[in-house]
Amino acid sequence: MNNIFYNDYISNGLLEVLLINDYITNGFKVEFLDIFYIISITFGVFTIISRNPVVSVLFLIGLFVNIAGILILAGINYLGLSYILVYVGAVSILFLFILMLINIRISELLSETNNDIPLAVLTVLLFYYIIGQVLPCNLTDKTIISSLSNRFTGIYNIDISNQSSIVGINQEIGYVSSKGWDNTLVEFTQISGIGNIMYTNYSIWLIISSVILLLGMVGAIVITIKQK
């Protein structure tokens, strides 16, 4: 993220760091995120209420592309491009080909699906509430949707619009690199940071997920084997 300014001063013998609000995200103003929010919510609703499953998958592809755009605007370029490659290039296209191969009855396409609209709206609101608690407060606090959520919910517990957020140096901060002071000054790329986290702190979870994927492949092969 660009245009993040830091100001340090000495108070009570401790070095404090002031984080000033960030209005620019990856070279773009954060107001552009409102456009992606509205389009993503629209695609998400139409994905659920669409009667034709093929059209529903197309809306799902559009939803994934918009989410990738949000990640790219947030400065997470690697995850945004990975979203397009994995979800759009593999998963969604696989769903689309499967739906084209199976026999879908016309009566199923013409069936009433308006009952799913409340579920679609509830799912979108729940997803946004969870994402709002995960993302940093200074990332989207100037957007329209975030201002509405701040009015009705207290999901952002740090107010940096009037007062700068103060982070004490004595607080525990998790670094991707080792504990050596010289390594903390080295700038990591996103790929290096993700690789260091996956293969050091969360290596056991990486192994567990690999075993789960292996069991899924073996299970699919066992099910499809013809019994003699």
Curated annotation (Swiss-Prot):
Keywords (A to Z) from UniProt: Mitochondrion
- Output this protein's name: Uncharacterized 25.4 kDa protein in COX3 5'region
Organism equals Emericella nidulans (Aspergillus nidulans)
GO CC, one annotated term: respiratory chain complex I
A single GO molecular function term of this UniProt record: NADH dehydrogenase (ubiquinone) activity
PANTHER family to which the protein is assigned, alphabetical: NADH-UBIQUINONE OXIDOREDUCTASE CHAIN 6
Judging by the UniProt lineage, the source's domain of life is: Eukaryota
Write out the annotated subcellular location: Mitochondrion
Q: Name one GO biological process term.
A: mitochondrial electron transport, NADH to ubiquinone
InterPro entries reported for this sequence: NADH_UbQ/plastoQ_OxRdtase_su6 (IPR001457), Nuo/plastoQ_OxRdtase_6_NuoJ (IPR042106)
